[in-house]
Amino acid sequence: MQAVIAIPELAGLVSEQQATDLVMRPVAGVPLLIRTVLTAARAGASDVLLVVPAPMSARPLQKLLGTIPRQEVRVELIQISEFDPQGHSSWIILKRHLKDEFLWLPWNWITTGEFVSQLPLVGIGSVDWSKAAYATVHEVDRESASSALPPRSAGGVAVTSPESAVAAERFLVARSGKVLDGIHTSFNRRLCRPFVTMLSHTSVTPNAVTVGGVLVSILSAIAFTNGTYWWSVLGALLFYVAGLFDEMDGMLARVTFAESPQGTWFEGFADGLSYLLLFGGITIGLHRHYGRLATVMGIALLVGAILALIATSLQRRRATNPDQPNEYLGRFYQLLEKDSGNWISRVVRQVQAFQRRGVMIHYIVLFTAIGALPLVFFLATVGAHLTWIVILYFNRRFFSQSSGVIPTVTKVKEAL
């Protein structure tokens, strides 16, 4: 898919240096023009046609665009005097570079790849050139156009001033969640928004935020080891904060285009480690009250948690492409929905959400506050062992044809 991005004539309004500064204005830590190009790539564009005014020096733009990895998107820069998207003559000049269908993105239009990828196809004569559009040079059948997705709200923010840049950042952070977010996770993300906005203006990486969450999980485990009510409540609250770190690292990665397969695997490993720390701390704390029984139960829980972590990692490798491990949960939900005729799939689809960390942290706090920590301990033990058993079942049911090879020690190490 092709995307067209045009920078208007700015020479008569501002100096060349000021024009360059405008297109390089950082929005949530990413230069404005780079953000527009990467948004097009995230929407599915593999080629970007960048139209710039003839008087504008192309050298700083080429240097800026050179920071984009070639595997992300290919950018072709064309200089045209007085390009006007509303003028038919401008498109005639671009005709030999233009494909029949293309994404139109104003250079200063901040939006999301998800929104752009869902735009309906419209004729070039019906485009609102101040916003993103999916256009074609051919006529569009009115019935098919009317049956397309209805236009939603503005779907973006035009950055024309420092104030609008702040509004654009709020827009991006508010939409940095996932389609599968439920009530619990959406609440968590609302709490995280100001911190994500702040972090986007620093050199802090998503992986650094992940490490911060692990450190808070260590403090949580230490608090649980004391075994008293108030120390346990403190441990639960710290574990909730650690869960917010888990939300923030993904939000920051999506806002700053810092997503990577390695980051997804690292986040998954950190989540598993945080659970092991939590269960270890609770085991030591309950041992002070229940003695050997708590220790035996804790060992069973830790074994189940480790097996569940390994099984989940192996299933993620089977269910997704190597460069898209972040699509694991969505892919797994799709398979469960297709297999809804199977009662096991129906039950797992309903209860699986409670295993997600963004949901779990709420119930850890709740059950700890009402003094039901032993019940959580028991349910977690049963749930951990059911998790790896169910994963093995679904591996055989969904993925046995795609990979009939029994996982080796090397594959287990790679998955972890």
Where are these regions (language model features)?
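Juxtamembrane helix-boundary/capping and inter-helix hinge elements in multi-pass membrane proteins
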Residues: 80-86, 255-262, 289
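Short amphipathic alpha-helical coupling elements at transmembrane boundaries
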Residues: 193-201, 250, 254-257, 264, ...
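Conserved small-residue-rich
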Residues: 177-223
